[in-house]
Curated annotation (Swiss-Prot):
Gene Ontology CC terms, in alphabetical order: membrane; transport vesicle
Keywords recorded for this protein, A-Z: Membrane, Transmembrane, Transmembrane helix
Gene giving rise to this polypeptide: TMEM187
Name of the protein this chain belongs to: Transmembrane protein 187
Membrane topology according to the record: Multi-pass membrane protein
Main location: membrane
Transmembrane segments: 8-28, 51-71, 94-112, 119-139, 146-168, 193-213, 233-253
InterPro entries found in the cross-reference section: TMEM187 (IPR028066)
Cellular location(s): Membrane
Amino acid sequence: MKPESGQALFHVALASCLCVATVHTGIFEHVSVQVGYEYYAEAPVTSLPAFLAMPFNSLVNMAYVFLGVYWLRSQARAPGGPAERRRARYLKDVFAGMALVYGPVQWLRIGMQTQPTAVLDQWLTLPIFAWPVAWCLCLDRGWKPWLFLAVEGLSLCSYSLALLHPHGFELALGLHIAAAVGQALRIQGRHGNISSGTYLALGVLSCLGFVVLKLCDHELAQWHLFQQLTGHFWSKVCDVLQFHFAFLFLTSLHTC
């Protein structure tokens, strides 16, 4: 493993551990989250252990791990010398590390159905959407480590909105999605090509599917197509796809 890859994974692990420790202090114990099988259209199978009680909604989270491993093993490409390639590898591997962490965290939420795991799942979603913003800023303004720290720090702090209002997380997530799409459109206009534009369009469509399918989980269950593989399951598929297309979009800009 390259030193910058190890550094990227260490930074992701450190930030994740700090989030876990913060959640377990109880500071977010009054945050409104959905806990319980009744919030999912997939019927739990009582004969299975808790971590597989909703088998499809549980196992789909392995896709994040596979995605993270795939991109962690992929080669980073960037114009310029070794320094530029090291920076491109760090950017890519932080994002891959986030995918590696996010899959197990979501599985914990599905399997345990506790308030702390639900909070952790919500909280870690925000810096994942913030990383493409930081990546785009790096492509546009050059390598500025303090900028990464500022973007991710602001993203993590934005979860405090969940303490102020029952829908504070949804507001924070909406702002993150808008910022990520806005930065991607801006960087596409300045540095993109047809290929990167295609990846961006597919990523935005996947993001739309991720949001709509999750919100309509119970409504879609009225249709036979969504009774076994529910809206929540397909929203996770769309989430993995938007992750993948974000990788393709951002890494393609390094070679434009």
